[in-house]
Amino acid sequence: METFKTKTFLIDELVGISGKNIEEHLKLYKGYVSNSNLVLNKIKEYEKDPVENVYILGELHRRFSFEFDGMRNHEYYFASLVGGKKEINSNGELYKAIEKEWGSFEDWLIQYKSISMTRGIGWVILYYDKQSGHLLNQWVDEHHLGQLTGLSPILCLDMWEHAFVYDYPTSEKKKYVEAFFENLNWETVEINLRAVLE
């Protein structure tokens, strides 16, 4: 059974991120969708005898969080590159929320980019916490370790090498981060926040 469907992302030519890198990256995303379905189906199969399969089920559930979060993180990531670069609206809710939290948009951006230089593979995620009304920046190892429970992703930056390997050596990942922001569609990020606030 296919519970999750692969989304289509029509991404125009980007500055500093090649079509080849996007093409290969999208193939990896499709793998996360496929594996999320595969693991979920295996869970349903082994749940027929949960006592006998308790350890197998435990490992499948662990694996599912990796595949599922990999799928969802990539959906936020690619969606933010669709439609070409759109500047952040300095009168918009997102900009004002960032200013309220960090003092200025520039200070937030410095912190976010700084987190992206964390050693290892993972994501930088800007979350909105509906309960407290605060925005939070967070490093997430792999796809799922460090995800903040109950918080909604607003902006996801993929810091796995596969996100930039065709364009930059790992020692130059800072250039990839700059390229990401050169192509970011802030209207999409604003929509992500509005969806949470509704």
Residue ranges of model-derived segments:
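Feature for soluble, non-membrane regions of globular proteins
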Residues: M1-E198
